[in-house]
Amino acid sequence: MASGSACTAVKIGIIGGTGLDDPEILEGRTEKYVDTPFGKPSDALILGKIKNVDCVLLARHGRQHTIMPSKVNYQANIWALKEEGCTHVIVTTACGSLREEIQPGDMVIIDQFIDRTSLRPQTFYDGSHCSARGVCHIPMAEPFCPKTREVLIETAKKLGLRCHSKGTIVTIEGPRFSSRAESLIFRTWGADVVNMTTVPEVVLAKEAGICYASIAMATDYDCWKEHEEAVSVDGVLKTMKENANKAKSLLLTTIPQIGSMEWSETLRNLKNMAQFSVLPPRH
């Protein structure tokens, strides 16, 4: 167990995906509109607590779901959460299953990604007038925080949720869904699920020295599976509505556990990795 001072240093950012951005999970909610060097985040930051753990909720696509995946300001979102003092970011995301055993309604605690995006800034060090100075070559062998993932996995087991302890997610540009040929190719690559938002979010969190973990909720079998209805907006929303309480339950139980743990070494290692990955400009 952590000491009292260590506990107060933990603040959890929650980025809610499609159907999973309900602010009601927070107690004592207040709204805070912020700006960043990269522009405005997707919406107001919702500040509050989950069982005495400070939390900040952000709707990835905006509270009215008006921002498509390619247009989400991922840089501003992560920057804003970092500036607000978040040590951790736990995100939820809808995804399509590429594996028979990952059924609609199942959760996957992602451990790897494949990037198929093409239009999104992936670094805070992008050479723009507002960017940090230098060039960052952040290691990505372990994109997601293993310690945070382990807490999510163990909590899901205790809650009796259908949850897969690892999975590789392929992030596509969107907003369209995959073709059948693409879906079949992703399977041969070893991908387990497909979505539109994990990259560059996870990369930017790593650059920011934040413990980042993702709860992926399978809503469908994408379109690779014969004799199965292909993914559709209606189907995704229906499954998310039916299963949103599972993700809420996992967050509400996991976050107090995270708040009771010692994170100083983990956070120090992440900070050092981020710092030593930057090549400063020559003078």
UniProtKB/Swiss-Prot annotation:
Residues annotated as signal peptide: none
Principal location: cytoplasm
Entry's localization field: Cytoplasm; Nucleus
N6-acetyllysine: residues bearing it: 51
Residues that, per the record, bind substrate: 196, 220-222
PANTHER family, per the entry: S-METHYL-5'-THIOADENOSINE PHOSPHORYLASE (PTHR42679:SF2)
Homology family: Belongs to the PNP/MTAP phosphorylase family. MTAP subfamily.
Protein name: S-methyl-5'-thioadenosine phosphorylase
Species of origin: Mus musculus (Mouse)
